[in-house]
UniProtKB/Swiss-Prot annotation:
Pfam families: GEMIN8. This is Gem-associated protein 8. The modification Phosphothreonine is found at residue 124. Residues 94-130 are annotated as: Disordered. Residues 110-119 have a biased composition (Basic and acidic residues). The gene is GEMIN8. InterPro entries: GEMIN8 (IPR034754). GO terms for cellular component: cytoplasm; cytosol; Gemini of Cajal bodies; nucleoplasm; nucleus; SMN complex; SMN-Sm protein complex. It comes from Homo sapiens (Human). The keyword Phosphoprotein applies.
Length: 242
């Protein structure tokens, strides 16, 4: 008898109540809770905008110039004067604290805001307690292939980014030679400036290296002073073979 009742209950139970769809319904309820809190926050923002003391109906505000373009200057001036002379102006609000017409609405909205804030706190606490259980998740062959393909794409993208960075670092502008180093760094230099050049001159000229290096420096300074005043850019060496 019990087996018959169990079989009938399984037959009458809808298909979407199967435990396989538990995670789906869990995510659905979380999304609906987020949407409800979003609607509540939007409604609170609109109510706070319309219930502020400085808000007045549209009949008391200056009309747009598109309503009456011919009488725009005078009508705008009249509305502006009426707004200043109106007893419910900003100075009146500052003296009385708030408009009597909207005081009851503000109090009611404050109570509603407190109730909504409590509901949102309860929703956030319940959302924090919810955890996704992945122990019963079935790992199929298609899912394994998907993960492997994703990892392969990530590795290819990482390798391509490294190649692009190396190509950008090794790029030489047309007005620079191959030994021009334009990199800047805040780290201390690995070797003393001119040490490599001094060792090369010592190897080439022996004891006369210092004298020849001084002569080269003098010639270079003279060239920079008299001949290289405007420092023209070198024409890029491009083979013109069409």
């Amino acid at each position: 008898m019990a087996a018959v009742k169990a079989s009938t209950s399984k037959a009458t139970r809808p298909w979407y109540s199967h435990p396989v769809y538990a995670r789906y319904w869990q995510h659905y309820h979380q999304a609906m809770a987020w949407m409800q809190s979003h609607h509540n926050a939007y409604r609170k923002a609109v109510e706070s905008c319309f219930n502020l003391p400085w808000y007045l109906p549209s009949a008391l505000l200056p009309q747009s110039s598109y309503d009456n373009e011919a009488a725009y200057p005078q009508s705008f001036y009249d509305h502006h004067v009426a707004w200043q002379d109106y007893p419910c102006s900003s100075s009146h609000f500052r003296r009385s604290g708030q408009h009597p017409r909207y005081s009851s609405r503000i109090q009611a909205s404050t109570k509603e805001d407190q109730a909504l804030s409590k509901e949102e706190e309860m929703e956030t606490e319940s959302d924090a307690e919810v955890e996704c259980d992945l122990s019963n998740m079935e790992i199929t062959e298609e899912l394994r292939q998907y993960f492997a393909e994703t990892e392969r794409h990530r590795e290819e993208r990482r390798r391509q980014q490294q190649l692009d960075a190396e190509r950008l670092d090794s790029y030489v502008n047309a007005d620079h030679d191959l030994y021009c180093n334009t990199r800047r760094s805040v780290e201390a230099p690995t070797e003393r400036p001119g040490e490599r050049r001094q060792a090369e001159m010592k190897r080439l000229y022996g004891d006369s290296a210092a004298k020849i290096q001084a002569m080269e420096a003098a010639v270079q300074l003279s060239f920079d002073k008299h001949c290289d005043r405007k420092q023209p850019k070198y024409w890029p060496v491009i083979p013109l073979k069409f």
